[in-house]
């Protein structure tokens, strides 16, 4: 089987992740393996964990952790989600399903690429406007 490389970042690192509004991801133009620190200077502050997974390996990702995955060859993987046991995590899950996905879907249909461009700009501005940048 093919090797899979995973980078994990704790939820505390969210302010430097260039999180795209109304989504569950960072900017898709970021290459976390070869970051462009001129374009995305906050990436230099990230402290992540790396894991190399081979056929049959399992990786547990705690709730709220960011992950970036690359494959060395053609492959597939399977993710399983557990129902949240903590009320705080349950409310986040419901907000994500009911609010975030709905707003994203409606706005993407209404505005198309303009919506994506708007959110990408906001992601960058939010990170770069931090006091310690």
Residue ranges and their predicted role:
Residues 1-60:
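Double-stranded beta-helix
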Residues 3, 13, 66, 83-85:
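Short, glycine-/Ser/Thr-/acidic-enriched flexible segments
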Residues 23-25, 35, 78, 86-87, ...:
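Short, charged/polar low-complexity linear motifs in solvent-exposed/disordered segments
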Residues 29, 73-89:
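A short hydrophobic beta-strand segment most commonly corresponding to one strand
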Residues 41-43, 47-57, 86, 91-133:
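Conserved double-stranded beta-helix
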Residues 54, 65-78:
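Ligand-binding loop in jelly-roll beta-barrel domains
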Residues 61-64, 112:
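C-terminal transmembrane module of eukaryotic multi-pass membrane proteins
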């Amino acid at each position: 089987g093919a090797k899979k490389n995973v980078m994990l970042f704790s939820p505390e690192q969210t302010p430097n992740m260039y999180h795209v509004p109304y989504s569950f991801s960072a900017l898709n133009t970021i290459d976390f393996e070869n970051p462009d620190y001129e374009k995305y200077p906050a990436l230099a502050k990230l402290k992540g964990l790396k894991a190399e997974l081979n056929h049959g390996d399992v990786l547990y990702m705690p709730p709220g952790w960011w992950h970036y995955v690359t494959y060395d060859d053609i492959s597939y993987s399977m993710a399983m989600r557990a129902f949240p046991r903590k009320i705080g995590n349950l409310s986040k899950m419901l907000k994500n399903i009911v609010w975030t996905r709905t707003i994203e879907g409606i706005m993407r249909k209404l505005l198309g690429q303009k919506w994506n461009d708007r959110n990408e700009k906001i992601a960058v501005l939010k990170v770069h406007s931090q006091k310690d940048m």
